[in-house]
Amino acid sequence: MRAVQAGPPLRRRHLGWWAAACGLCLSLLAGCAALDEQQRRWIFQPSDRTWAGGLAAAEGMQDVWIGFDSPASGQAVQLHGLWLPQPEPGAPVLLYLHGARWDVRGSAHRMRRMHELGFAVLGVDYRGFGRSSPALPSEALALEDAHAAWRWLAQRQPSARRFVFGHSLGGAIAVALAAEVDDEAGLLVEGSFPSIPDVVSSFRWGWLPLGPLITQRFDAGARIAAVRSPVLVVHGGQDSLIQPALGQALFEKASEPKRFVLVPGGSHHNTNALGQPQYREALAQLFGLDTLRRD
């Protein structure tokens, strides 16, 4: 009787296992890629639209275009921004980084209020927003865009004191930018958070173990200690979207000098308007900007 040769069937079986394992890995990778893409859409909600009040507030602002070659995407990028200069040559300059959903015109009212405090203001749209180059935004791409806008400001206003301002999601981008540059005069963050997992945990269903699945983490809490300039964290006392405790937690992780301002009655959207007196006081005390306009 001839012996049964087990080699080829076993080899075929091993090949089958390897094929199944490779297929599973490819499926997981595809699933991770799809999950990452959905998170980017959910977090940024990129749009070329704004609300009616934003359209009116943006009227008269100067259009600017910031071009650069993106190492992250390997493509040429054009960013659209709105520029509000000051007549005084020595005025401080503010880079405004907006949050999710609306394009930069949706933040024009905040930009004007910061302009009324004495700043020259540049607001910029990330890729995928407004008239900037089309792309699905990500944490890495948005930070790259913020760096490009910061370089534009440095070239436009080389002798001015330059500040970084971020609202909501833009606050996390502002923290990351301020942690990586060394020429900012100060960081201002309004209605922001330590990380996306922290925001998710604050929701009603936040007990679900979703943290490990979050790819777009925006870990401002881990980065803010590296910011070497003074830090102002502002939050609305009635912010129901990003809870005040999250702003306080971000503030606690920052290095001195720093200041936390809680605006009574402020929501996620009107804190900047209600908190103008607190802003003026904090800007004078923390940054020494006591010569800002008071008209």
Feature locations, PLM:
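N-terminal cap/lid segment of alpha/beta-hydrolase-fold proteins
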Residues: 49-87
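Catalytic histidine neighborhood in serine/cysteine hydrolases
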Residues: 253-269
